[in-house]
Amino acid sequence: HYITKLVSLLKKRKVSIFLEEEYYSQLKELLPENINSFTKLDKSYDLLISIGGDGTILKAITFVKHLSIPIVGINSGRLGFLAKIKIDKIEEAIDEIISGNYSISERSLIEVVTSEKNNELSKLNFALNEIAVSRKNTTSMISIETKLDDKYLNSYWADGLIIATPTGSTGYSLSCGGPIIMPEAENLVITPIAPHNLNARPLIIADNTEISLKVNGRENEFLISLDSRITTLSNTNVVVIKKSPFKIKMIELENESFLITLREKLTVSYTHLRAHE
């Protein structure tokens, strides 16, 4: 199992290892006895290793939050933009990291505040990729009145609206026709989901802009999603989205940069297109 391989590699290199409590309880039969677990992190930790895909990194961020602990993503599935280290490259990657041969990519997050208190959102109100509002009912569109810094922009008549970070620009927003934004760019993108008016295009804005959304529609409620977490809000809510006060630090190895991953992704898409011609 690659987890036991990783633990063995780290122990040989005299690294102190702590596994997340829930994960540890599932794997402890496979692990050496002197492995510790954690439920919360503090600033005494040097690095968090996430094993899975980009979704696993989104969960890892909920542990790190504002602590500035660098995160490294090991990919056990398809090629990801965040979890970029392949399973068969674990040993090389660990040695590079221990030797300090890496750079830090700082990623902006966005957070949401609602005019009416919502317990689910107040516990964890930030997202790395995107915050999206969308219709709850599958048959009718919603109108999303959108303001930027309290100035009226537009009322989008659509299935929903995505507010994406540069990191999230390669995800849901991209599949709805949004642009790819370089991770270090200080921007956000507003992308309509299946707009009624085909002239409603994605809009790139400065990331210090405060975005205010008010939803109207036949239903009294709408859905709001923060990355993979989703909850229901009443139409009486005003949703305010802005940049979070903290950033996440992602470890990037020299041969695993954003441009290399982007090129590989684009090449894969092009190859699939050629194969179907």
Feature names for model-found ranges:
Residues 211-236:
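A conserved acidic, glycine/proline-rich C-terminal tail/linker
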Residues 155-159, 163-199:
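Gly/Ser/Thr-rich active-site loops/lids in small-molecule metabolic enzymes
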Residues 50-54, 61-63:
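N-terminal glycine-rich "phosphate-gripper" loop used for MgATP/nucleotide binding
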Residues 1-47, 88-103, 114-125:
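ATP/NTP phosphate-donor binding region
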Residues 16, 68-70:
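Proline-centered loop/turn at the N-terminus of a beta-strand
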Residues 271-277:
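Conserved small/polar residues in nucleotide/adenosyl-binding loops
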Residues 78-159:
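Catalytic core of DAGKc-family lipid kinases
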Residues 54-56, 79, 167-169:
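Short glycine-rich anion-binding loops that position phosphate/pyrophosphate groups of nucleotides
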